[in-house]
């Protein structure tokens, strides 16, 4: 082809161009767009792309559930996911990786309404898991307590303990929002509607009920616990909360010591009740260089907190006295009274000791034998202290603050005798009150079943005969106490887990032990739940329906994320 022929090549639309043996076909502009659009549709509709897109959506949905789960577990506001968690995650991913990776996090639905729905879904899922377990016919025990939230709405918390797999499991059974004016009968009706009506549980499987001794629970007009026991056909046992009983014991105090307590509280209120006084005392204590510069408030509902309050008042007694003199307060006069200050030292010690006893009875998965040991041990300790004070050479070693005060100050002998008599009367009163709230006859059944605490302590047939067991039970205990393998399990397992583990080999002893260990002995979990409620339902969130958040925050069950993912991601419209 000559150059001239190349110059005259047809370049019209739809024509062809021939260049050195290559034929180029000109495609119209409209056809070209259709061609690429078809190719694009093929790519987008390919299984690989669809799978990738579906996977990303599933990951975003799962991430949304996981974030909502953490928000509820940490008792955070629902807006925290979108306002705090997401921006923080994007900052971290952008810093460590790149902007493109960070932008992918925006596909995760984290609005406050979405988080709220996710928490409700998780709560219903956890509730269904728990109820399915309880509906299988296993034995369970409950503890219940009532309180009011920040919006003055009564709330009833019910916890359950049941046998699952290889140990006891404790979980929140229900959180019921009640009407403003409610009686014990109303509480029973609400509880029965929930457990029997909604959950379809059977009262015959309830083996224990624990509550405090308030009028709404045990009063002669309401008698909630009595109605619950009737519903179980008296197959369950009722335990008055050990912690509540110990708090009632600690309130037994003579008028003289009560005056010391009231004046100490008045002093704290005078200083802490005024922001100016509180700041001035803080500045004064800082200038002197003392260890603490603040006083502590006391609340009546936390009666035993007075131990820390009194200890702080005693520690800062000299600084408080100087401050009160400068303020020309009449309360300064009480700090000039040696007897008053000495009694203050004693009260700070005894309330601290009672507080330690209360802490020993708090916690999860404690068995009744541990509580029995703490109570009986403290009762004997009180008797020992009384004997020490009655001796010719009285000793105050058990009250370190009081002992240090006596050693560092010159106290009149007559004053010291008066104080010793006051302390002795208080310890005697404590012993009597302990015997009233923890009567020895109530513990007789526990003492008869002490073999449950350590079955390997009964190696001899003679010791087993004294336990008043049935012949079949005696034979099981003899075989059990002779097993070296099971003794090793006993050392490493909890008491409840041990008896559950051997339920097939020793059914009689195991069943008897489980029924005794299963009931709660305190309402500690309810008190813990109400503390969580105060964190969830604040003044800014006083309209929150706290039940779903409480369920997720306190549940012992672990969500099945695959099952949740199979549910509808968006609510029906």
From Swiss-Prot:
Protein name: Protein FAM200A
Organism: Homo sapiens (Human)
Main localisation: membrane
Transmembrane feature ranges: 514-533
Subcellular location: Membrane
Keywords: Membrane, Transmembrane, Transmembrane helix
Keyword Zinc-finger: no
Gene: FAM200A
Source superkingdom: Eukaryota
Similarity comment: family membership: Belongs to the FAM200 family.
């Amino acid at each position: 082809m000559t150059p001239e022929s190349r110059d005259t090549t047809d370049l019209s639309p739809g024509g062809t161009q021939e260049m050195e043996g290559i034929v180029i076909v000109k495609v119209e502009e409209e056809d070209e767009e259709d061609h690429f659009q078809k190719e694009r549709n093929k790519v987008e509709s390919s299984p690989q792309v669809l799978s990738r897109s579906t996977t990303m959506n599933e990951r975003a949905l799962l991430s949304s559930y996981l974030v909502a789960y953490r928000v509820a577990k940490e008792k955070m506001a629902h807006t925290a996911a979108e306002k705090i968690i997401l921006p923080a995650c994007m900052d971290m991913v952008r810093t460590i990786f790149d902007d493109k990776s960070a932008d992918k996090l925006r596909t995760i639905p984290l609005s406050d309404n979405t988080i709220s729905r996710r928490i409700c879904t998780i709560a219903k899922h956890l509730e269904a898991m728990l109820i399915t377990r309880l509906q299988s016919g296993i034995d369970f025990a409950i503890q219940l307590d009532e309180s009011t939230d920040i919006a003055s709405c009564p709330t009833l918390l019910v916890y359950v303990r049941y046998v699952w797999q290889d140990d006891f499991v404790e979980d929140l059974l229900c959180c019921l929002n009640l009407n403003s004016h409610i009686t014990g009968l109303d509480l029973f009706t609400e509880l029965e509607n929930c457990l029997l009506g909604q959950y379809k549980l059977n009262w015959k499987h309830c083996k224990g009920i624990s509550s405090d001794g308030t009028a709404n629970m045990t009063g002669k007009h309401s008698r909630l616990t009595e109605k619950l026991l009737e519903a179980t056909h008296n197959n369950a046992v009722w335990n008055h909360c050990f912690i509540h009983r110990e708090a009632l014991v600690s309130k037994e105090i003579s008028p003289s010591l009560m005056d010391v307590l009231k004046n100490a509280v008045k002093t704290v209120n005078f200083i802490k009740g005024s922001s100016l006084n509180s700041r001035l005392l803080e500045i004064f204590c800082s200038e002197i260089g003392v260890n603490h510069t603040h006083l502590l408030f006391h609340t009546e509902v936390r009666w035993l907190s007075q131990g820390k309050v009194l200890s702080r008042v005693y520690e800062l007694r000299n600084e408080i006295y100087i401050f009160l003199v400068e303020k020309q307060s009449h309360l300064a006069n009480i700090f000039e009274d040696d007897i008053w200050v000495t009694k203050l030292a004693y009260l700070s010690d005894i309330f601290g000791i009672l507080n330690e006893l209360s802490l020993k009875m708090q916690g999860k998965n404690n068995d009744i034998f541990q509580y029995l040991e703490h109570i009986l041990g403290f009762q004997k300790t009180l008797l020992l202290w009384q004997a020490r004070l009655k001796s010719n050479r009285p000793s105050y070693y058990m009250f370190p603050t009081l002992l240090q005060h006596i050693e560092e100050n010159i106290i009149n002998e007559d004053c010291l005798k008066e104080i010793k008599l006051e302390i002795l009367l208080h310890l005697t009163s404590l012993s009597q009150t302990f015997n009233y709230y923890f009567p020895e006859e109530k513990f007789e059944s526990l003492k008869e079943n002490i073999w449950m605490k350590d079955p390997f302590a009964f190696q001899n047939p003679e010791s087993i005969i004294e336990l008043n067991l049935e012949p079949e039970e005696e034979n099981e205990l003899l075989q059990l106490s002779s097993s070296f393998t099971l003794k090793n399990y006993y050392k490493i397992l909890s008491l409840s887990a041990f008896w559950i583990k051997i339920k097939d080999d020793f059914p009689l002893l195991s069943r008897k032990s489980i029924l005794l260990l299963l009931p709660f002995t305190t309402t500690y979990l309810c008190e813990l739940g109400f503390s969580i409620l105060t964190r969830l339902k604040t003044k800014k969130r006083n309209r929150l329906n706290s039940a779903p958040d409480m369920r997720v925050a306190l549940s012992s069950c672990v969500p099945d994320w695959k099952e949740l993912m199979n549910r509808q991601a968006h609510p029906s419209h």
